From Swiss-Prot:
A zinc finger (C4-type) spans 57-72. May play a role in DNA repair. It seems to be involved in an RecBC-independent recombinational process of DNA repair. It may act with RecF and RecO. InterPro entries: DNA_Rcmb_RecR, Rcmb_RecR, Rcmb_RecR_Znf, TOPRIM_dom, TOPRIM_RecR. Keywords: DNA damage, DNA recombination, DNA repair, Metal-binding, Zinc, Zinc-finger. The keyword Cell membrane does not apply. Belongs to the RecR family. It comes from the Bacteria. This is Recombination protein RecR. PROSITE patterns: RECR (PS01300), TOPRIM (PS50880). It comes from Lactococcus lactis subsp. cremoris (strain SK11).
Amino acid sequence: MYYPEPIARLIESFSKLPGIGQKTATRLAFYTIGMEDQDVNEFAKNLLSAKRDLRFCSICGNLTESDPCAICTDPTRDRTTILVVEESKDVLAMEKIREYRGLYHVLHGTISPMNGISPDEINVKSLITRLMDSEVKEVIIATNATSDGEATAMYLARMIKPAGIKVTRLAHGLAVGSDIEYADEVTLSKAVENRLEI
């Protein structure tokens, strides 16, 4: 189907977003065109601001406006526990349940032999360094229940256990192949409560 070039480019831009197919991208493009100029400008400004103003925390790797992030600098957090997640969105999901009061570490991905992603290509080295220089007694591995998530969890357990640090894994309620981001708060709460040592 033919669209004027500005619409075609907008559709193409929307279709690059995860989970957005051609049909949804087209719908979003036409919706955006119908928006008031002020709303479009605010949307564009917010996109640019998020891209420009956010950075990764130098301690945990979470997205933040200030470095170190608010979680790492919060004196009320339990500094003896670190919960390891794949992405920053997983930190948000865990914070929603309000059960976990420790620190986090964001890997920015998983080990994936099939995709050629090795431990050196995710945020593992800084975790190991962090563990050697801290009072951490337990690392909770909260990678997704996928083959890559499991491979990453096993690798991390092998790296961390020799240091005498307890390594646990989220438990009950997370189906194999599921993403933490999409789990409901009760399921996540139970998974943290019933974590298993690995």
